[in-house]
Amino acid sequence: SDVYKRQGAHDVYVFGDFNNWQRTEIRMQRDAHGVWSAFFPEAMYRDRLRHGSLYKLHVHGDNGWKDRIPAYATRVVQDEATKNYTAQFWAPEPFDWQGDAFDASKNGSLMIYEAHVGMAQEKEGVGTYREFTEKILPIIKKDGYNAVQLMAIAEHPYYGSFGYHVSSFFAPASRCGTPEELKELVRRAHELGLAVIMDLVHAHYVRNLNEGINELDGTDHHYSLPGKAGYQPYWDSKLFDYGKDEVQHFLLSNVKYWLDEFHFDGYRFDGVTSMIYHHHGYVDFD
């Protein structure tokens, strides 16, 4: 079964390679609380809906029919030919964390090396989690650091944003590799005595409709305030409405997810001034 909450949506379907991309074959049901759900009988989908399957939502809202990626997707990939992003059902064998009992508090005062996984390599092109693990972590350790801070690594469509225009908050950037390769990076860092800090972006999200969570239910205020109040003009992005219970649940579950699933040791929260001030930190006090 699968469950989504789309309060402003009129109709929601789920489709993918498991049903030959038939958009309106599997209709989700909405309950009294605005939660949409669909049930997939095991006997029917055991051999079709499996690890690696691709899927999307077909959502009918006030902005028409849109093909969307679920907000809680844990793996999102880009088609090389069309450049479109699609959610991927990701259910590999459980990662072996045996022996990873790292305690960052024992490192004392932190000497933090900040790095961008894709840009830290000497080669031309986008670096990978595996390359960072094999080539960069030993250098960080050798130079005397005891912590590494990874710049924004959640899925993002525009590489030039350095990862700060997030589209899928629960999915590691697929251009750098698989979730398991990111987990291996963290595990190896811990073996070297390095704490791993994640740069977490909860101040805003990308405006894109095809890839992101903007207007996911067909309204402009599903995760944000309506109109200009939900727009960050300096970053050309959308602002979260932290007063909504659902937004708080979404962001807090995201905090817990990266700690539990990837064993990150802590966070550096990006754009905090934009989260707590109406002027977003762009103000002249003279």
Show which residues each predicted segment covers.
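Short beta-strand elements bearing conserved aromatic residues within extracellular beta-rich modules
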Residues: 12-14, 55
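A cross-taxa feature marking solvent-exposed loop/turn segments within ectodomains of secreted
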Residues: 21-23, 50, 143
